[in-house]
């Protein structure tokens, strides 16, 4: 048996439960919107998976990782795009970070980077601006004006 998330129903037999524990580790949907800090993001994610907020903060602020990906501790929050992600409950903090980084890299296509550059912005600045706009108005129709 491995650590994880499992579903056990009332009508399951002992054999069904054992088979479930052996082979049916369920994915957890981890969702977050704009967070105001890496600490709040780590706390939000740690409430939904086994990894604790300290281990998440450790990998989120790892200076080697940040420098290899052209981020600083101040801009690192922009790498973690608000969305829903699926993880197994016992996914390590490093694997969580890797999946979130991969989503960031997939999102920022060369076309999107060119559009940002045409507006005189970097991808990090676009993320910051988007977070401000979303925070200032929860009314979707008002957001383009802001």
Give names to the regions the model predicted.
Residues 1-146:
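Conserved catalytic or metal-liganding residues and their short signature motifs at active sites
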């Amino acid at each position: 048996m491995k650590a994880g998330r499992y579903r056990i129903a009332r009508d399951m037999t002992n054999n069904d439960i054992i088979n479930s524990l052996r082979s049916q580790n369920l994915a957890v949907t981890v969702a977050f919107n704009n967070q105001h800090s890496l600490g709040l993001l780590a706390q939000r994610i740690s409430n939904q998976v086994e990894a604790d907020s300290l281990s998440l903060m450790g990998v989120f602020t790892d200076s080697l990782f940040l420098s290899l990906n052209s981020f600083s501790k101040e801009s690192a929050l922009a790498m973690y795009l608000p969305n829903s992600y699926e993880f197994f409950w016992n996914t390590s903090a490093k694997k969580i970070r890797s999946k979130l980084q991969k989503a960031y890299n997939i999102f920022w296509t060369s076309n999107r980077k060119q559009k940002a550059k045409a507006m005189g912005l970097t991808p990090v600045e676009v993320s910051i601006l988007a977070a401000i706009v979303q925070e200032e108005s929860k009314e979707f129709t008002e957001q383009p004006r802001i």
